[in-house]
Each structure stands twice: as structure tokens, then as C-alpha cells.
Amino acid sequence: MYLMTCTRPDLAYPLSLLARYVAPGRHRKVHWDAAKKVLRYLCSTSGMGLVLGGRARVVLTGHADASWVDDLATQRSSQGYTFSIGSGSVSWRSIRSSSVLGSNCEAEIYAGAMAAQELRWLTYLLTDLGEAPRSPPVLYVENKAMQALCQEHRLEHRTKHIALRYFLARELQQRGQLRLAYVASQANTADVFTKALQPCDHQRFCTVLGLVPTVPHLLTS
């Protein structure tokens, strides 16, 4: 858990998934096998570390994503986000929704609200450190319907059931504190927080997050 929270964002989704089966009577052999697979992955990548750096000017950028109804047992959705400053990730999260969501757009809105809340806190923190963003931080999402709802400032009959408190991203955009932008799924870094990926895609996103070999001799194939 410490690694997932502090230095290994690539562990966020698998540990979030396994945490759902920690309660007595819920875990089965398949979950134990999955936990051992995570440990094997961690041993083979123990030389990986999160490296921060990049531009001289602080630029805060975020990605948010949701995987709709990926938990077949509860019909709930996985949601995640990541924020980076320069070339490294400074904040991330992977979580299952607290309720059943009616559409992929709704799941993306909930993920966007969660990310917007973290973005607001990071903006306050940077301001206190004397590094207030010079322009609205960009939050990338891959659902165009969610982006349109936040830009058009209106609700339709298909979305008016969504609690208004989840339109935090829209409110911040109206205030000029956030800019929503579209990103294709293949380029959305938050994908690694919502679903299992092919090894090549997983490695590519790890590099984007800032996870690079820091102790090369500890890496195994």
C-alpha cells in the first residue's frame, strides 16, 4: 500500500481490485493467485522508480478515465485519474464507484468530478508554494459527451438525474480554473488506473507516468 500511494502508481489498479476481496469469505484462490502475480511483478520491477523533473516552469496536467460496469458482480465502474508536473506523476487514484452508474458518460462525469476535486487542491498547494499555474490546468478526458455537457452548461433528459455536485469540472471550467480537453483512449494515461492493459501498453503508460529504471541491475525480464 505504501508503494502504491507514494512511488508506484502502476500498482494502483491491481491493488484497488484486490482490495475488494479482502473481507473474510470474499476471497478465493483466483484472488490469491492474482495477489502472487502482483508480488512477482513487483519483484521483477523493484529497480523501477518515480522520477520527477522536466520543464523549468510548473505546468499541471491531468488525465481522468472510467471503465463502465467492469465489476460484473456489483455492476459498478472503475474510475481513476493522474496529475503530472513536468515529466512525473505527482498524484493518482484508482477507485470503484460507490453506486451503479447508468451510462459511460455518467461514469466519466463522476471520474471527472473526482479529478477536478484533486486538481483544485493541487492548485491551492502550488499557489501556497509560490508556483500558482499561469494558465488553467488541462484535464484530459476521452468521453466527448462528458466534455460537451461541461462546455454547453445544460442538462438533457438523459442526464438530469446526475447529481449536480458531480459537475465540479464544469464549474471550475466556467471560473477559468480548468480546461477540459479530449484525448484518445490510446493516449489517455489514466487508462492504467481503470483496466488491465496489454504488457506493451502498460509499459508505455508507466514511462509516461515517470516510472523509469533507477536501479537497472534489479530489473528482470
Predicted regions and their residues:
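Conserved pre-motif C helix in the palm subdomain of viral-like polymerases
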Residues: 1-13, 67-71, 75-78, 104-124
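RNase H-like nuclease module associated with reverse transcription
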Residues: 21, 59, 95-221
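Conserved helix-loop functional segments at active or binding sites
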Residues: 44-48, 69, 89-92, 121-128
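C-terminal reverse transcriptase regions that engage the nucleic-acid substrate
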Residues: 1-48, 184, 192-194
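Acidic, metal-ion-coordinating active-site neighborhood of RNase H-like domains
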Residues: 14, 37, 63-72, 83, ...
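Residues immediately flanking
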Residues: 54, 64-66, 85-87, 141-143, ...
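Structured nucleic-acid-interacting core domains from mobile-element enzymes and related host factors
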Residues: 40-66, 131-133
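RNase H-like nuclease fold core
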Residues: 62-105
